[in-house]
Amino acid sequence: VAGILVFAKTPAAAKDLNKQLQNQGFGKYYRALVTNAPSEKEGTLEDYMVKDARTNTSRICSAKENGAKIARLHYDTVPDHGRLFSTVSGSSSSVDVSLSSQSQECHETELEIHLDTGRHHQIRVQLASIGCPIVGDTKYNPELTGNKRWQTIRLCAYKLDFKHPVTHKAMHFQLEADPA
């Protein structure tokens, strides 16, 4: 996981930033390189999730399950010319890659994700649940367990929007696309 982080310099600034986070005042945008393309080029995923602190995992569950919290994200497919990630082969376009001993072919697709909620491992769990696990995610993609082909998970917090905690000026930070 890579990307942009925000740190507060003072306790008052931290309090304001936390308040913005809780009231959905933060625009949190991620890029993920996933195996397989979602059935729709853009969409909203809304599920209930529960965290298992013992195993440091989360899973989708029913709304009635003890500890269940709503999890909502929006995704959009990124065109090849706007990619942040290079594909596994180093190409800037989608490629087919073999992920398992059965040589199951998967198609890499880059998604832009906007979080409405920020649950533990939310993006990883929800994308895996629709058959689009993140490249390099050995926790939620059993096809990759023990596979060392990718060194890191291809998930990046690439854009943040929020109001400055003192001046209330709109702040916008964004990583540039991979020039390769």
Regions found by a protein language model. Give the residues of each.
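RNA pseudouridine synthases
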Residues: 1-180
